[in-house]
Amino acid sequence: MNVPEVNIKQLLEAGVHLGHKTLRWNPKMKKYIFGEKNSIHIIDLTQTVTFFKTALNEIHKCVSRGGKILIVSTKKQASEQVSLLAKETDQFFVNYRWLGGMLTNWNTIQNSIKRMKKLEDQLSKDDIGFTKKEILKQGKEKEKLQRSLGGIADMKKLPQLIFIIDTNIESLAVAEAKKLNIPIVAILDTNSDPTDIHFPIPGNDDARRSINLYCDLLKNTIINASKFIEIKPIDDSKEKSKNKKLNAETVVKKTEEKSI
């Protein structure tokens, strides 16, 4: 499987090893912590390398099978990068606000997406037959929907995998994915809870340099995996049956010719 290299040097340079202050830690992250320095927990990067490779392999496997990934982070430091990553790799994203039921109440969310697209279509026309006040009101509604749903506007069904940066902020996303048994890959800082995360990646979830590195690794993995999307094998049982029938007909025909 072809995934990008992950090594301790690049993680160090991006500040991935820097956790939160020791007072803010989650004891469940203890096994991922190397030690502390100046009252800040230091993440064990040897484990980060191992877990990151495992996660990237899972992402590669998902995409190469034609699966789609939902990339989630509504925090300021990651918002722009998450949007860019998803657009460059043809995946989906949520980077403004996670709406309750975004996964577990998918039918209702789809109706909201339809409403958003209808407003986009209406407001793109020169003469839409509404007053200025109505146009202004609809414009605000459209913008509100676009902020929350623009990244999943073309998502026809639930994603096969979710990638999250900061599970504390995105606790609703974690809970909904867990309920629906959707695998979660997540960056876990020293104040995170790894309990419901299938593929944890211990690392700094606040520094822009760290977030940029995560997104770059994810981007390269997805782009590479897209080249190997599995084509559904042709069911040759019908073809074999057809050939058998043709062979049988040929034999009968030859027999009839001999008897004439």
Where are the regions a protein language model picked out?
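Ribosome large-subunit tunnel/peptidyl-transferase-proximal elements
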Residues: 2-233
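Intrinsically disordered, compositionally biased charged tails
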Residues: 1-9, 223-260
